[in-house]
């Protein structure tokens, strides 16, 4: 399951609630073509990796979160463990997304 993040407080709460689990955050926008292309794959990964927390942040709805996380383009995927960022890349690269999850989980 992918959790939609609606606010900075909800983002921080989701990171805190994850504990030791890997958190994968998809920063995207409704007008972004590559974001739309990778979204179904991102959701399928959330079914496959039940021990990983998947979050979605719409950069237009949560500009403060995107700004704090220094997101420059979409889609950007960031990876967190224990509240600390442990990885990041930009672009709709399915292979890299799954490989990074496997590397960090």
Curated annotation (Swiss-Prot):
Residues 3-105 form the Thioredoxin domain. Its main location: nucleus. In the fully reduced protein, both Cys-69 and Cys-73 are nitrosylated in response to nitric oxide (NO). When two disulfide bonds are present in the protein, only Cys-73 is nitrosylated. Cys-73 can serve as donor for nitrosylation of target proteins. GO terms for molecular function: protein-disulfide reductase activity. One of its GO terms (cellular component) is nucleus. The modification N6-succinyllysine is found at residues 8, 94. Participates in various redox reactions through the reversible oxidation of its active center dithiol to a disulfide and catalyzes dithiol-disulfide exchange reactions. Plays a role in the reversible S-nitrosylation of cysteine residues in target proteins, and thereby contributes to the response to intracellular nitric oxide. Nitrosylates the active site Cys of CASP3 in response to nitric oxide (NO), and thereby inhibits caspase-3 activity. This is Thioredoxin. The lineage of its organism: Eukaryota, Metazoa, Chordata, Craniata, Vertebrata. The gene is TXN.
């Amino acid at each position: 399951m992918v959790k939609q993040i609606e606010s900075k407080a909800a983002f921080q709460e989701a990171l805190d609630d994850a504990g030791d689990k890997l958190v994968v955050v998809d920063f995207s926008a409704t007008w972004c073509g590559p974001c739309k292309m990778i979204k179904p794959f991102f959701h399928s990964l959330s079914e496959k990796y039940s021990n990983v927390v998947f979050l979605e942040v719409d950069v237009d709805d949560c500009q403060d979160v995107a700004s704090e996380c220094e997101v420059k383009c979409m889609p950007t995927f960031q990876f967190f463990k224990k509240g600390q960022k442990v990885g990041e890349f930009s672009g709709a690269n399915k292979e890299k997304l799954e490989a990074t999850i496997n590397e960090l989980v």
